[in-house]
A protein has these predicted regions:
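Transmembrane alpha-helical segments in multi-pass inner-membrane proteins
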Residues: 211-295, 299
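Alpha-helical transmembrane segments within multi-pass membrane transporters and channels
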Residues: 78-121, 266-268
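Helix-loop-helix "hairpin" substructures at the membrane interface of multi-pass membrane proteins
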Residues: 156-237
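Single transmembrane alpha-helix segments in multi-pass membrane proteins
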Residues: 23-77, 103-112, 257-261
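Cytosolic-side transmembrane-helix boundaries in multi-pass membrane proteins
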Residues: 1-18, 138-140, 195-209, 278-324
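Extracellular/periplasmic helix-loop junction at the C-terminal end of a transmembrane helix
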Residues: 119-156, 302-307
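Residue-level recognition of pore/gate-forming positions within transmembrane alpha-helices
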Residues: 36, 40-41, 64-69, 90-94, ...
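Membrane-interfacial amphipathic/re-entrant helices at transmembrane-helix boundaries
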Residues: 1-41, 81-85, 322-324
Length: 324
């Protein structure tokens, strides 16, 4: 156990060191990609949190959009500072998610999946209809965040390099919070609801309450991801949060695996690296993504996170066969 913890600490320290020096090695293009990568990490890991109870939600991306719109409006119309808009936008997304859950919580499995798409799409279409959200054009000229403590300092994140480090810090904090939750007793209850709902109910577990909790916590972090994305892009519109984006999120999760905390991180990292190479396929990229998904479902149903165990099993089987 001690050796595992030591290796984990060393690995994390090496990774953080790499991420700190990365923007000084690569061009601005790759720094921008890294910021998108950080946002996608928060989005994917928060989505996986919801799946621990057995619920797969296509409303996750629209709720991310709710956080993005809230952060943009608070910045442009109210002039609120970033450190206030960031958590508030997450809370607004959470409250909207709670309203959406009222009809959804009565559904399970496939019905929940389809119902979440319908309600998420209704939310997205409301941004087109309501003028405060800018209609089809969305909201432009979203100011870069600044962090100011009167009498001490003012940090401006209008340049890509400072914003990279801001996004990195927020991502690390969000992932750490979700990791601690994943290691807690609460997530064990989430998994029990997924694996043995009747048994969990028989021992007094409030299944509805814990499903709501998982959904709301995941939605909060999705809202945070939306704020980071809005400030990075400087523009948001309803088309950024369409079904296609939600399907890509599902592919990241399924290919990476969602049984453990590490799975979605592996999935997002895989597509962040190979996604750039796949750009040569142009309009055929969705087909390539589909082929990767089918291959993963056929040969790695538990995702890329299960690859080391699977290879170890095959090597042992081959070794045993050779000895016999």
């Amino acid at each position: 156990m001690g050796n595992n913890i030591t290796r984990t600490i060393i690995g994390l320290a090496a990774l953080i060191t790499l991420l700190v020096f990365l923007p000084y090695i690569f061009s601005r293009y790759y720094i921008d990609l890294s910021i998108v990568f950080f946002v996608n990490l928060i989005l994917a890991v928060s989505f996986r949190l919801i799946t621990t109870t057995g619920d797969f939600s296509l409303a996750h991306v629209p709720l991310m959009g709710m956080g993005a719109y809230t952060g943009a409006l608070m910045t442009k119309n109210l002039g609120l500072p970033f450190l206030i808009t960031l958590p508030l936008a997450g809370l607004v997304a959470t409250m909207v998610g709670l309203v959406m859950l009222y009809p959804l919580i009565r559904m399970k499995e496939f019905a929940f999946f389809i119902g979440s798409y319908a309600i998420g799409e209704a939310l997205r279409l409301s941004w087109i209809r309501l003028s405060i959200f800018g209609g089809h054009r969305g909201i432009s000229n979203i100011a870069s965040p600044t962090i100011s403590i009167p009498g001490l300092f003012t940090a401006d994140f209008s340049e890509v390099l400072p914003y990279y480090f801001l996004t990195l810090v927020v991502t690390v904090v969000c992932l750490l919070c979700m990791y601690l939750l994943d290691r807690s007793r609460i997530t064990e209850i989430f998994k029990a609801i997924h694996d043995e709902p009747e048994l969990a109910k028989s021992v007094g577990v409030n299944i509805t309450g814990y499903r709501v909790l998982a959904f709301e916590v995941g939605t909060f972090f999705a809202g945070i991801a939306g704020v980071l994305s809005a400030h990075h892009m400087g523009h948001i519109d309803p088309h950024q949060f369409e079904l296609t984006t939600g399907l890509y999120l599902l592919i990241w999760i399924v290919v990476g695996g969602y049984a453990t905390f590490l799975g979605p991180i592996i999935g997002v990292t895989f597509f962040a690296i190979f996604g750039e190479w796949m750009r040569v396929f142009g309009a055929w990229m969705p087909l390539v993504y589909g082929c990767i998904l089918i291959t993963a479902l056929l040969f790695l149903p538990d995702g890329l996170e299960s690859l080391p165990k699977r290879l170890s099993f095959l090597l042992k089987k081959t070794g045993a066969g050779a000895k016999s």
